[in-house]
Every structure is written in structure tokens, then in C-alpha cells.
Curated annotation (Swiss-Prot):
GO terms for cellular component: plasma membrane. The gene is mscL. GO terms for molecular function: mechanosensitive monoatomic ion channel activity. It comes from the Bacteria. This is Large-conductance mechanosensitive channel. The chain crosses the membrane at residues 14-34, 38-58, 81-101. It is found in: Cell inner membrane.
Amino acid sequence: MLNEFKTFIARGNVMDLAVGVIIGAAFSKIVDSVVNDLIMPIVGAIFGGFDFSNYFLPLSSNVNATSLAAAREQGAVFAYGNFLTVLINFLILAWIIFLMVKGVNKLRDSVDRKKIEEKPDAAPPPEDVKLLTEIRDLLKTR
């Protein structure tokens, strides 16, 4: 059973998946930083200097706080600001992945085109095949 497990782990697909998950986790942190530290402050400046993550709607009448943390202590709130931040984060990540896939597909297409261009022309058919083709064509015309 141990040998079977070693074979399973040593397969390329499992290793590729492990590397992908690790890189994805690190990449997610980069995107979070880009959104929270670079994009959201600009969006906040454009829309009057506010922070989306602090936006909420009170769901109970005793919530009258102005910050999300204080409002959560007072009662139930609908914290849609954090959702907006996460949504923007997702859209940026999806856009970056789209651009990466598009680039890889373009590279793959150019490699495939080069392979097609590099293929030598097909060898001319042998004389007997040419003769049989001519006979077939003559029989079709009759």
C-alpha cells in the first residue's frame, strides 16, 4: 500500500495540483493587497473618502453605531461593504487569470502554427497510385 501511495504522489498531476494550490494561496495574498492597499483607497477617494468594508445596514432597531465593529456588538447587521470588497477582489483575480489563460493560449497557438509550418510537404504519391487515380477519374467520366 505504501508503494501505491508513492506512485500516486509521484504522478505529475498530483504534484502540479499541489504547486498550483500553493501558488494560488500566495497569489491570493498579492491580489488582496492590491485590492485593499492600492485599488480601494483610490475608489474611496473618488467616492468621497469612504471605506467599503465599513458599510452596513442595521437589521435590528437598537443598532445605531457608525462603525461596523460597534454595530455588530449592538445587534444584527447586514454588512454589505465587506462583500463589495471581496467581490472587487474576485473580479480582479478573475481578470488576471483570464489574461494569463489568454496569454498561454496565444503562446500555444503560435507553437502549433510553427509546428504546422515546419512539417515537410507530403511525399508525392507513388506511380501506381497516380495511375489508379487516373483510371478512376476516367471511369467516372464515362
